[in-house]
């Protein structure tokens, strides 16, 4: 694999592309969609691993990319939105790739106002690897 740059992906105007909504102030959650901020985040074992604190958006392709969590113990980590199931009516976010206790070990960022290309790889790899290795029974063959 190739190591990606320790710099953020940029928009055509030279701004960091993926940022929290506290930076991209013109983004908002539409009224008909649940706002995940404040919702507890549950792992595949249904144990709470943290609370959603912020939404990270893509300025170039307007969509949510990550949820910023305060993991158990206070560490701030990102969760790819593609691996999160926001259950608005239940008021929880469910994640099948890792256990509740594993959120606190997710990679951190140098700055919580942007994410570098290398940091994106680390964050996505952490949760993606959990699909195969988060629990002992996932690490063994099915046969």
Predicted segment positions?
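Peripheral interaction segments used for macromolecular assembly
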Residues: 1-143
